[in-house]
């Protein structure tokens, strides 16, 4: 099923033909929005998008397409936060396998304020709710990214503010969140 918050966009699961566009958007976001570029320890999934998101039935990459271009992404991976750098108590609370981690929620600058991120995150949460084995939906974000903190506070509950810990080093202010698990219904991604 496709979703569109705005008639000029198509929101759907990624296909192999979306990989290059999704990767380009992600790498551009690391450089222009976050200012630190590609970090292999943090961004392995970006190099192997097919293996990470398309080949695993419990993982998902969603894209928003506009005029044939990928302009927004959101991913779901079966993984919790890793200790270190994240606190041990978070790694224990959100274990791999039963945690759907929301990742790579990026919208190209010229396409913001159209409801793309919010709709993609809702689709990702619905996917987690209809995928067997997930008990929780977790994410962390760098609140230095423009609009990130307000956006996530409108959709999720803070579970730990790591800004004082410096867990990712200078220039990264991490806050950890949990999204309430939606009540399962028909699979919105596969319908």
List each model region and its residues:
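Actinobacteria-biased recognition of intrinsically disordered, low-complexity terminal regions
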Residues: 1-4, 185-191
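Acetyl-CoA-dependent GNAT
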Residues: 13-104, 108-109, 121-123, 127, ...
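Short hydrophobic/aromatic beta-strand or adjacent loop that forms the aromatic wall/cage
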Residues: 59, 171-178
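Conserved beta-strand-loop-alpha-helix junction that forms the acyl-donor binding cleft
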Residues: 112, 138-148, 166-170
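Conserved GNAT acetyl-CoA-binding A-motif
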Residues: 121, 128-140
